Each structure stands twice: as C-alpha cells, then as structure tokens.
Amino acid sequence: FAAAEHAHKLQPTSESAAGCAQMCIKKEDYAGAIEYYKQALSMVDNDEDKADYLYRMANVYVSLHNYQQGVAHAQQALDLNPEDGRCYLLMGICYASAKVYDDPILQRSVFWVACDMFRKAKTVDSSCATDANKLIATYSQYFPSKEDVFFHRDLNEGQPFRVGGWIGKTTTCRSKAE
C-alpha cells in the first residue's frame, strides 16, 4: 500500500487515486477511501467515470452506515448516468436500513420506498433485474400486515404515503402478501 500511495503522490491520476481508495477499503479505512475517491473525481472529465466514482463513494458511505450520504452520492451518480440500475439498488438498500420513525408500523414504510427503488433499477437497467427481484422478495416480507395497515390511523392501503425523516419520499401504502 505504501508503494502505491507513494507512486500516487509522485504522479497522481484518477486511476491511482481509485486504486488507493480500494486499498483503504480493504483496510477498513473508509475515511481514507472517501478522500481518495474525491481526488479521483476531481481528475476526470467524463460523466461515466465521475458517475462510477460517485457510486463507489456511495458504497463507502453505506459501509459507514451513513445511509443519507449513500443516497446523496448514488443520486449524484444517477444525475450523470440515469441508466445505472446499481445506484437505485444501493439507494433502496439505504432506505431499507434507515431508521426514521419510532412507531414500529410506520417504520415499515421504508420498505415501500426501498422496493420502489428496486423496481426502478430493473426498469432502467435490465442487468439488475435478478438482484432487484431478490431484494423485492426479501424486503416486501417486511411490509406491514393488512391488519396493521387497517388499524393504523395514518395508513390507507393503496393510498399515497409520505415517508418522513431524511427520506422525504412519497410512495404507496401496501401490506405484505399473506
């Protein structure tokens, strides 16, 4: 690692910065990885490479359990490359991992938004369909029951629901298949 870092300092390129970031990730030095990805990002001109580095940074933030930054960086990558389904998959995983409600029934609304993202991933990028379908099957099991939806004053099956907290997305209220 020291040799790669030294070579990067002598002749920095986006590739050498990304390589150093990968080595930092292997050592679980996520702060270092983010810094190297920022360097890599500053050295590229084309949107495809920028989107790739932003996606990689998003993954590092997920490793740090900083889901809000994970979503923010995945969204920046999508702004540059709207057909990258991996970004939607990652955003869905971030939403599913987020804690935005104390109410255990409302907390399950994060899974609706997550599944929306997984569906979007396979719509824009067919190479993500298998992973998206697996994630939908996994996370839709955590939707609230029909009974929980019926008895909760804030929920109506099939109606729009705005998920609060930092997510701030409107989705459709759904119950799990029984």
Residue ranges and their predicted role:
Residues K9-L10, M43-N46, L80, V124:
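Structural marker of alpha-solenoid helical repeat scaffolds
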Residues K120-E178:
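Terminal, low-structured helical/coil segments at or just beyond the last alpha-helical repeat
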